Amino acid sequence: MWIYILVGIICLLAGLAGGFFIARRYMMSYLKNNPPINEQMLQMMMAQMGQKPSQKKINQMMSAMNKQQEKEKPKKAKK
């Protein structure tokens, strides 16, 4: 009787751990393919702040954000 409870708890924990890692991998690939901010969103944000965004300024900000994301990736891998 107690073996069934023990096996059930072990299976539950294994399912939770497996589900967590599968969901984490899915979300990381989703965010890599669909970044949370794009040029149109950046242009809209700048317009809301009262700035008239030029394409050069938008490209500079996008490249700065991409560099920041690339810079953070190695830090996360080391942990």
UniProtKB/Swiss-Prot annotation:
Transmembrane intervals: 2-22
Span list, region Disordered: 57-79
Topology in the lipid bilayer: Single-pass membrane protein
Tagged with keyword Cell membrane: yes
Start-end of Polar residues biased regions: 57-66
Taxonomic source organism: Listeria welshimeri serovar 6b (strain ATCC 35897 / DSM 20650 / CCUG 15529 / CIP 8149 / NCTC 11857 / SLCC 5334 / V8)
Sorted UniProt keywords: Cell membrane, Membrane, Transmembrane, Transmembrane helix
Similarity field: Belongs to the UPF0154 family.
Pfam family, one: UPF0154
GO CC, any one term: plasma membrane
Entry protein name: UPF0154 protein lwe1321
Subcellular location: Cell membrane
Stored InterPro entries: UPF0154
